[in-house]
């Protein structure tokens, strides 16, 4: 049976029970060390944070943003971010693309569901979708936590903030070529 190791700093943030306020104890449950309240029995499950990443490819170029904040400040990334309470992945994708590029879009197909261990946010579940611009050849204008937006040739990508984004772009290219029976 495979178990994941949880970083000590992940467990350290859970010192008191959210239900009763008593101190939490680290206990091995189901093959994992988990914060547990011995007073009321509450178990804290350390679940991944859901995030979305958008892949807009037009004419062999992919839309990237230069991040203005950590993690990865100054590096390039797909338009992406965390889902908000009450959002679907599809609505989160459209919101993130608009906030970071000013482009209105509609969600396409799910390209990938992968995980990423981030030094700031911990374990992140990344849902990547293809998206279609509502206006062909739309001009991207950086906004929100993006300081720049640019279309890059998929064969010459800049240094990306997240390895998962490079993998997602490659997966999108493969799916596109399979759907259109062509080699990119």
Go through each PLM region and give its residues.
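Acidic, metal-coordinating catalytic segment for phosphate/diphosphate chemistry
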Residues: 6-53
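A short coil-to-beta-strand element that immediately follows conserved catalytic motifs
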Residues: 27-28, 104-112
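Conserved hydrophobic "DFG−1" position in protein kinase catalytic cores
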Residues: 56, 64, 131-133, 151
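NUDIX/MutT-family hydrolases
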Residues: 141-172
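Conserved N-terminal beta-strand and adjoining loop/helix that marks the start
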Residues: 39-63, 82, 113
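Conserved Nudix-box catalytic region and its N-terminal flanking loop in Nudix hydrolases
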Residues: 4-7, 57-99
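Active-site-adjacent beta-strand/loop module that shapes the phosphate/pyrophosphate-binding cleft
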Residues: 114-138
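A broadly conserved sequence feature marking short terminus-proximal activation segments
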Residues: 1-13, 155, 159, 171-179, ...
């Amino acid at each position: 049976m495979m178990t994941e190791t949880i970083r000590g700093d992940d467990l350290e943030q859970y010192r008191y029970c959210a239900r009763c306020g008593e101190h939490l104890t680290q206990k091995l449950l189901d093959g994992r060390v988990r914060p547990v309240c011995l007073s009321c029995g509450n178990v804290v499950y350390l679940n991944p944070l859901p995030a979305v990443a958008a892949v807009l490819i037009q004419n062999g170029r992919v839309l990237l943003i230069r991040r203005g904040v950590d993690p990865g400040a100054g590096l390039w990334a797909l338009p992406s971010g965390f889902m908000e309470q009450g959002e679907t992945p599809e609505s989160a994708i459209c919101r993130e693309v608009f906030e970071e590029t000013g482009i209105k879009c509609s969600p396409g197909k799910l390209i990938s569901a992968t995980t990423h261990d981030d030094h700031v946010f911990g374990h992140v579940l990344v849902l990547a979708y293809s998206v279609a611009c509502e206006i062909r050849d739309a001009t991207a204008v950086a906004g929100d936590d993006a300081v720049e937006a640019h279309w890059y040739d998929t064969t010459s990508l800049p240094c990306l903030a997240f390895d998962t984004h490079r993998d997602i772009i490659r997966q999108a290219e493969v799916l596109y070529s399979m759907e259109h029976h062509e080699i990119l």
